[in-house]
Amino acid sequence: MVDAAPSRPAGRAPRPGRTVGARQLAALLPDPAGARPAYRHLAQALSTLILDGRIALHATLPAERELAVALGTSRTTITAVYDLLRESGYAHSRQGSGTWTDLPEGRTPRGISRLIGPQDTAIDLARAAPGLPQQTLVDALTQVAPQLAEHAPTPGYHPYGLPDLRAAVAERFTRRGLPTLPEQILVTSGAQHALTLVIGLLCRPGDRVMVENPSYPNALEALRRAQLRTVSVPVTDEGWDIEIIESTLRQVVPQLAYLIPDFHNPTGFLMPERERVRTLRAAARSGTWLVIDETLADLALDVPAPPPFASHATPGGTGQVITIGSMSKTHWGGLRIGWLRAPARLVTELAGQRVATDMGGSVVDQLLALTLLAQAGDLLPARLEQLRRQRAALAAALAEHTPQWTWRLPPGGLSLWVDLGEPVASALAERALEHGVRIESGAYFATDPGLFEQRLRIPYTTPADTLREAVQRMATALADDLTVRSAARRPHWVA
């Protein structure tokens, strides 16, 4: 239910240029004929979209008449929807400015709550990120402590990253088959920071960027905030369609392409070598910068770990390939250390841009990362074996409690991309929370409205017993009366 919020002054005015079209919004909403009363059903769905970030805050909503036409309902119904949103704090209106989205007092956007985790006893399957064994962290801190004495007398600013860490990351690339110099490495505060720096330097508002669909939501949000136009290429149950990738690069000529070829998030798929080669060649012909997200590349569970994407380029052909990596998925997200590999000249420009925002990363975190990378030969095999056990436990629990769901066991990564067989994922995610499980609807990973409502991303990063309990709770939630969303059956809005 949409609960009424205490009266308060109208929220901040809508952001100029940030609007939600009637057809775009209709593609995200359920069929108003699917429940009674329709206005309350639509208001609940709309508040959920605002809360989880699929509709931006302070964005202008369509006029009542336009939305009524797009949904095939009466204007009276939409008027009641907007009234209920205003009463509950999810919208505000002003003469001449229309109606725009907001959050009630005390509510946190789910983009933030996904990261900080549940503040209750719910099982958290919204974050595909493992924890770090306590003793591993304690031992690493013990080793790092004496090294801090060397750095304490210095200012501590390293916009390029600690020289030793840059060298270690470069050596890691070289060992994996891509000769790399320390000058080609920029240490960042995580992979997301690396992507944001690249976008800020190479792109301008309105530029086109090729992305996979589905893709990593935080990357899509970074592109949206930079006012870039995404052009999506599908990742289906059969993997990537290289012909669509080639034709998109040839016809659209995007400024940048963001790809996750190694145990793709959320599907877990691994791009074959021949498709990597063809992608590199097509990007070289179009002059497109390739940004390759390798944060999951080490998490190979059933196959050998893949070599770097850029290693498949022709000699001298890696000039427009940027590779992003991180400690978050292999070690711990609390260690805010990532990196990018790029031509040395570009690294210099990126470091210059970085100084305007954060001056450089934490010396302590970088020393910890250096210590953990040196121990990766011992730590990583244990991590992989743990993930294999947990993946098997999740698959067995799904087969037992939800046999109607289907999935493909990924060769690596951190999650299953589960097909529910009907577009109820968002409704199930809401109902599962009532049963004590936080889970992500596939729609959160979509580049276009109305897609992947039949999918859930279920990580296997928590203990096996917890996964089994979570699946049992989801099965109980599934037995409830879920309203089937009709968005997948409507033509989705296209920019």
PLM regions and their residue ranges:
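Conserved core of the PLP fold type I
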Residues: 152-287, 298-316, 481-495
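Hydrophobic residues in well-ordered beta-strands that form the structural core
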Residues: 211, 232, 292, 439-441
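Short hydrophobic/aromatic beta-strand micro-patches
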Residues: 341, 417-421, 459-461
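Conserved glycine-rich beta-strand-loop-beta hairpin in the small C-terminal domain of fold type I
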Residues: 387-395, 405-419
